[in-house]
């Protein structure tokens, strides 16, 4: 210790002893202006053999027990360094040099657990709401709470928990050591916003040293003195992380990251779950770059979190909204394309849309009448075109195609748009013009149309352009030219049935549906309007 530092400390000791009680407030206001005093006091505390250590500890205790808050904070800034020296001396079994620091720590503890009347304090803690972001979670990952009567009753409810009573301690033991130190760290964290930068640096150095001392990682540090392994408590490490987290965002970014890694290293070795949870949450929430510390006197945490108010508007998606969107889309297609076919509505994903024609809005009825008019107008020209296409395809048909064609033509092909409503599952169908369905015998119509529509999607041939419900006449003509020998599962089943008996129908009007008569990838219902 230099002579100048010693003179500064001795002057400070004599000045406070001669200070009257009326000037304590003014003395506390000017104490922070002494720039050389704080570094000199750190040197005295770090040297356990210094003769000024005992009077300095006594002076710090007198400042803390005074009624002036600023004098208490002046003593609190040395608390991390005092803890490190105490733990280091405890491991080295140097009880004689450790007596004054131990008395100072116990004195601060006994002052904090009791009020002015000597009664024990009960500390209260407010449980934060999950709707606000923290280092553990983001509120966007939690679903919105239902607006119920119970939720409204608990809207302004503040949940508070209370700590147990802390008994007074006369001396340190192995059982109560970290109980006292954890409570002292709690007191330090409650006033950490008033601490200077030198106190933050001392906190980070203390946290790193107590975690890696006695472990192989200690040799990677550039410390002058080595220390034995220090026993730690999970609660003390959590309180240490609380102070380190604030110091990282207020000028100690590099030191804070170093001590954070050291705490995770020690917590993994000791299998402490609570420090691991807090430390990993802190590490995952850190930004990539150091926060802006150009502003002097800034005492806030700058953490980038997800906003509580969602920026993306979430509109409820219901069956009605899907139908409205589909009707608008089909109306636009009917106006632009002028097709003569009837587009069937897609089934809502996740919903069952088996509504009848009477449940449709009035605005869709004119579109149905316009479609019927377009069917009548184009029927004559379409039938002539179909005859030419059928004659061209018939010449290139194979014997197998003709067999399947005979069975396929036997199905009723007269479908009427006026009497049915089609509700397929994820497919678009189109009815060629000129197909009429009688309004009676609705049950056989459902069964027959289900089978025929299944075959029309699986069996791709040129004959489907004029004889069945297909994907479209023009598309069927192109597919017939390129894929004349393409068969699906249903067409192969029909071929086997045709070889067993050509004159036998695939499905009779009164026969029940079987697994072979249904397409595995498509389902359609035709509901007759009564």
Swiss-Prot record:
Residues 353-373, 514-530 have a biased composition (Polar residues). It is found in: Cytoplasm, Cytosol; Cell membrane. The keyword Membrane applies. InterPro entries: Hyccin (IPR018619). The modification Phosphoserine is found at residues 321, 341, 430, 442, 444, 491. The modification Phosphothreonine is found at residues 30, 306. The keyword Cytoplasm applies. Keywords: Cell membrane, Cytoplasm, Membrane, Phosphoprotein. One of its GO terms (biological process) is phosphatidylinositol phosphate biosynthetic process. Residues 328-410, 498-530 are annotated as: Disordered. It comes from the Eukaryota. GO terms for cellular component: cytosol; plasma membrane. Component of a complex required to localize phosphatidylinositol 4-kinase (PI4K) to the plasma membrane. Belongs to the Hyccin family. PANTHER family: HYCCIN 2, HYCCIN RELATED. Component of a phosphatidylinositol 4-kinase (PI4K) complex, composed of PI4KA, EFR3 (EFR3A or EFR3B), TTC7 (TTC7A or TTC7B) and HYCC (HYCC1 or HYCC2). This is Hyccin 2. The gene is HYCC2.
């Amino acid at each position: 210790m230099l002579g100048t530092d010693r003179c500064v400390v001795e002057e400070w000791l004599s000045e406070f002893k001669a200070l009257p009680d009326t000037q304590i407030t003014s003395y506390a206001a000017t104490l922070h202006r002494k720039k050389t005093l704080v570094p000199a006091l750190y040197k005295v505390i770090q040297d356990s053999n210094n003769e000024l250590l005992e009077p300095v500890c006594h002076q710090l205790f007198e400042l803390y027990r005074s009624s002036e808050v600023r004098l208490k904070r002046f003593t609190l800034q040395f608390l991390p360094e005092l803890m490190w020296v105490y733990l280091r001396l405890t491991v080295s079994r140097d009880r004689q040099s450790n007596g004054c620091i131990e008395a100072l720590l116990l004195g601060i503890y006994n002052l904090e657990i009791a009020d002015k009347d000597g009664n024990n304090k009960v500390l209260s803690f407010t449980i934060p709401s999950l709707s606000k972001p923290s280092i553990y979670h983001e509120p966007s990952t939690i679903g919105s709470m239902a607006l119920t009567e119970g939720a409204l009753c608990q809207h302004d409810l503040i949940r508070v928990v209370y700590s147990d009573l802390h008994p007074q301690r006369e001396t340190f033991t192995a059982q109560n050591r970290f109980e006292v130190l954890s409570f002292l760290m709690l007191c330090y964290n409650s006033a950490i916003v008033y601490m200077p930068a030198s106190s933050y640096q001392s906190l980070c150095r203390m946290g790193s040293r107590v975690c890696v001392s006695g472990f192989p990682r200690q040799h990677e540090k550039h410390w002058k003195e080595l220390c034995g392994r220090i026993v730690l408590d999970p609660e003390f490490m959590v309180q240490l992380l609380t102070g380190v987290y604030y110091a990282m965002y207020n000028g100690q970014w590099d030191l804070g990251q170093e001590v954070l890694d050291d705490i995770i290293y020690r917590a993994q070795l000791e299998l402490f779950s609570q420090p691991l949870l807090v430390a990993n949450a802190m590490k995952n929430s850190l930004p990539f770059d150091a926060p802006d510390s150009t502003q002097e006197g800034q005492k806030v945490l700058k953490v980038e979190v997800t906003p509580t108010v969602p920026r993306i508007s979430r509109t409820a998606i219901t069956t009605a909204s899907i139908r409205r969107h589909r009707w608008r889309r089909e109306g636009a297609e009917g106006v632009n394309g002028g097709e003569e076919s009837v587009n069937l509505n897609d089934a809502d994903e996740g919903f069952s849309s088996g509504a009848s024609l009477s449940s449709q809005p009035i605005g869709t009825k004119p579109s149905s009448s316009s479609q019927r008019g377009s069917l009548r107008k184009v029927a004559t020209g379409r039938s002539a075109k179909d005859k030419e296409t059928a004659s061209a395809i018939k010449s290139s048909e194979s014997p197998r195609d003709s067999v399947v064609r005979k069975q396929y033509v036997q199905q009723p092909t007269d479908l009427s748009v006026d009497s049915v409503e089609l509700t397929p599952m994820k497919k678009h169908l189109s009815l060629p013009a000129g197909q009429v369905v009688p309004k009676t015998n609705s049950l056989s119509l459902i069964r027959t149309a289900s089978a025929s529509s299944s075959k029309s999607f699986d069996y791709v041939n040129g004959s489907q352009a004029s004889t069945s419900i297909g994907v479209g006449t023009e598309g069927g003509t192109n597919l017939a030219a390129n894929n004349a020998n393409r068969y699906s599962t249903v067409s192969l089943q029909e071929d086997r049935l045709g070889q067993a008996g050509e004159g036998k129908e695939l499905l009779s009007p009164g026969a029940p549906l079987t697994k072979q008569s249904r397409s595995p990838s498509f389902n359609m219902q035709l509901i007759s309007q009564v």
